[in-house]
Amino acid sequence: MATTNDIGDRGEEIAAAHLDGAGYEILARNYRHSRNEVDLVCRETDAGEYVFVEVKTRSGTGFGAPEASITAKKRAALQHAARGYLHEHGAEGAPARFDVVAVMLTGGPPEVQHYENAFWAD
């Protein structure tokens, strides 16, 4: 039986492959700043903007839609980590956005939903 970590890791791999296939450059995985983490840091090739991605994976619908589990506290943590990444890479003020990739693993082919500009930075 797959553990929660296994399911999450598989979802992140699927999300990264999906984004790569859509023209995103994957810059970092599981980037940590302080105690905050961003699952994927990307750069959209066409627009040149940084994209901070939260991946939510579910193996069933018992806990609701994956994207519905991103709380205000989680959004704040993602924003903190994103600011840290931009600072560390000398990119403060660069165009950036927050996306969510929801992955459903229900036994058949994975279902992937990509929500661009899923929320705004405070």
Swiss-Prot record:
Coiled coil: none annotated. It comes from the Bacteria. The lineage of its organism: Bacteria, Pseudomonadati, Rhodothermota, Rhodothermia, Rhodothermales. GO terms for molecular function: nucleic acid binding. Belongs to the UPF0102 family. CDD domains: PoNe_Nuclease. NCBIfam families: PRK12497.1-3 (NF009150), PRK12497.3-3 (NF009154), YraN family protein (TIGR00252). SUPFAM superfamilies: Restriction endonuclease-like. InterPro entries: Restrct_endonuc-II-like (IPR011335), tRNA_endonuc-like_dom_sf (IPR011856), UPF0102_YraN-like (IPR003509). This is UPF0102 protein SRU_1822. It holds the Pfam family UPF0102.
